[in-house]
Curated annotation (Swiss-Prot):
InterPro entries: AAA+_ATPase (IPR003593), ABC_carbohydrate_import_ATPase (IPR050107), ABC_transporter-like_ATP-bd (IPR003439), ABC_transporter-like_CS (IPR017871), P-loop_NTPase (IPR027417)
Compartment list: Cell inner membrane
One cellular component term from this protein's GO annotations in UniProt: plasma membrane
GO molecular function terms noted in the UniProt entry: ATP binding; ATP hydrolysis activity
Reactions catalysed, as given in the entry: D-galactose(out) + ATP + H2O = D-galactose(in) + ADP + phosphate + H(+); methyl beta-D-galactoside(out) + ATP + H2O = methyl beta-D-galactoside(in) + ADP + phosphate + H(+)
Origin superkingdom: Bacteria
Organism: Pasteurella multocida (strain Pm70)
Family under the similarity heading: Belongs to the ABC transporter superfamily. Galactose/methyl galactoside importer (TC 3.A.1.2.3) family.
Record's protein name: Galactose/methyl galactoside import ATP-binding protein MglA
Broad class of where this protein is predominantly found: membrane
The protein's Enzyme Commission number: 7.5.2.11
PANTHER family associated with the record: CARBOHYDRATE TRANSPORT ATP-BINDING PROTEIN MG119-RELATED, GALACTOSE_METHYL GALACTOSIDE IMPORT ATP-BINDING PROTEIN MGLA
Keyword list, A-Z: ATP-binding, Cell inner membrane, Cell membrane, Membrane, Nucleotide-binding, Repeat, Sugar transport, Translocase, Transport
Summary of subunit composition and partner proteins: The complex is composed of one ATP-binding protein (MglA), two transmembrane proteins (MglC) and a solute-binding protein (MglB).
Length: 506
């Protein structure tokens, strides 16, 4: 494919040329390039570990580049700190929101640069300026509200407003829709359109292809730290982008279904959670070797089902049976001992210990099995089990002692799944297992799910991605406002039928 650069008449705001960055044993960037124009949304794409975040951290002053040139507004720059980048017109909306939750919205917006009057903070001006920005961006939040009381999407709006307040020319957005509802995503896109109209260049990182093709003008693809291509969205297909990202053609998005569901292994009858609003009278069966999907709109209480089964959400009534034997599952420890495992939705906050090793993260759910009768840890067994996780899950890592936080999202998720497999579960529950994972790593997770189903595991998979549910599962349970709206055979259903069921009890 020939390189296409659209909008030749647009002003070039940023040029990064032949940027290199190495860490011990790893060349993270190898002559990477990026050109961003005014009035445009520029997608930066690549598999996890391709160098996207490293490139932007070199721009934003978090990392110092080893080689290469950065031109911003026609002048060479080499920002030493993120504060310097901000003050010069480059802003970043992080995936993990950097807000002080104990402070008010307006305090967060003007932190470190409060307006002063006679040597004191001018709260009136701060309020008025915040209100003016919010009105321009259609943000309906009280500037005096404590950040701790806001939703994730509202916090994200504050981060964007902060970029706006700095009069940023370049706004970097890293997976901005990962925790947003469909309505919130639409609001975000309207704000992006306003920033674009204002003359900003937006650098947009996302694994969601539909978003890229909806709001972006150009795409730069990185692979293994190298620049692969920059293309116009118009005239480029999804398959071409995927091929450039992974270095090969992905002929199928999903592996073939080679599992055979057998007899019923799990029965859930009239399950109701204690603290409402939550799930009410949820009933279903799961068979050995079956992948049961759970679909529903945001707020449908899909996660509440697996949390109640796993004992981390208290049960008011209902019965859970494994092999026709009733399971109390009063807490997670009891559930684990009974053969249940839960891979949680928010990998970064509840799934991994980012600053600890792969070994620790692999073994933490099964630590009791490494303690001898004398109370000593068996280092040999710990090392062999960690190696089993790395090998069987195909985790790409230099060492079992590597901090898990330094791995890509896909490799982190493989470690989490491997950790649970060490407990030898019969029921594996996966909540948004491919969220924030690139398309190549997603395929590996799908293959893993299929292999586990072939080994007669009962698998429950919650997903907000409809193609994923239709491509991986055998049946789909559809939730609507805490109730089961229907259970459909995947091979016989459609996206339209699932969406109709999802709206049944609204």
């Amino acid at each position: 494919m020939t390189t296409q650069i659209p909008n030749q008449d647009s002003e070039i705001l940023l040029t990064m040329t032949n940027v290199c960055k190495s860490f011990p044993g790893v060349k993270a960037l190898d002559n990477a390039n990026l050109t961003v124009r005014s009035h445009s949304v520029h997608a930066l794409m690549g598999e996890n570990g391709a160098g996207k975040s490293t490139l932007l951290k070199c721009l934003f002053g978090i990392y110092s580049k080893d080689e290469g040139d950065i031109l911003f507004l026609g002048k060479p720059v080499n920002f030493k700190t993120s504060k310097e980048a901000l003050e010069n017109g480059i802003s970043m909306v992080h995936q993990e929101l950097n807000l002080v939750k104990q402070c008010t919205v307006m305090d967060n917006l003007w932190l470190g640069r409060y307006p002063l009057k006679a040597g004191f903070v001018d709260h009136g001006k701060m309020y008025r300026d915040t209100k003016a920005i919010f009105e321009e961006l259609d943000i309906d939040i009280d500037p005096k509200e404590k950040v701790a009381k806001l939703s994730v999407s509202q916090m994200q709006m504050i981060e964007i407003a902060k970029a706006f307040s700095y009069n940023a020319k370049i706004v970097i957005m890293d997976e901005p829709t990962s925790s947003l509802s469909e309505k919130e995503v639409e609001h975000l896109f309207k704000i992006i359109a306003k920033l674009k109209q204002r003359g900003c260049g937006i650098i947009y990182i996302s694994h969601k292809m539909d978003e890229i093709f909806k709001i972006c003008d150009e795409i730069t693809i990185l692979r293994d730290g190298k620049w692969i291509n920059t293309v116009a969205v118009k005239g480029t297909t999804m398959d071409q982008i995927v091929s450039m990202m992974v270095g090969r053609e992905l002929t199928q998005r999903f592996p073939p279904k080679t599992n055979t569901p057998k007899e019923t292994i799990l029965t859930v009858e009239n399950l109701t959670a204690l603290n409402q609003p939550s799930i009410q009278d949820v009933s279903f069966e799961l068979r050995k070797g079956e992948v049961l999907g759970i679909a529903g709109l945001v707020g449908a209480k899909r996660t509440d089902i697996v949390e109640t089964i796993f004992g981390v959400r208290e049960r008011k009534s209902g019965v859970i049976k494994l092999h026709d034997k009733e399971m109390k599952n009063r807490n997670a420890f009891e559930a684990i001992n009974n053969g249940f495992a839960l891979v949680t939705e928010e990998r970064r906050s509840t799934g991994i210990y980012a600053n600890l090793s792969i070994e620790f993260n692999s073994l933490i759910s099964n630590m009791k099995s490494y303690i001898s009768k004398l109370g000593l840890l068996s280092n040999t067994k710990m090392k062999s089990d960690t190696q089993w996780v790395i090998d069987s899950m195909n985790v790409k890592t230099p060492s079992h002692k590597t901090n898990i936080g330094s791995l890509s999202g896909g490799n982190q998720q493989k470690v989490v799944i491997g950790r649970w497999l060490l407990t030898q579960p019969e029921i594996l529950m996966l909540d948004e297992p491919t969220r924030g994972i690139d398309i190549g790593a997603k395929y590996e997770i799908y293959q893993l799910i299929m292999e586990l189903a072939k080994k007669d595991k009962g698998i429950i998979m919650i997903s907000s991605e409809m193609p994923e549910l239709l491509g991986v599962t055998d049946r789909i349970l559809v939730m609507s406002n805490g109730k089961v709206a229907g259970i459909v055979n995947t091979a016989e259903t459609s996206q339209e039928e699932i969406l109709q069921l999802a709206a049944k009890y609204l």
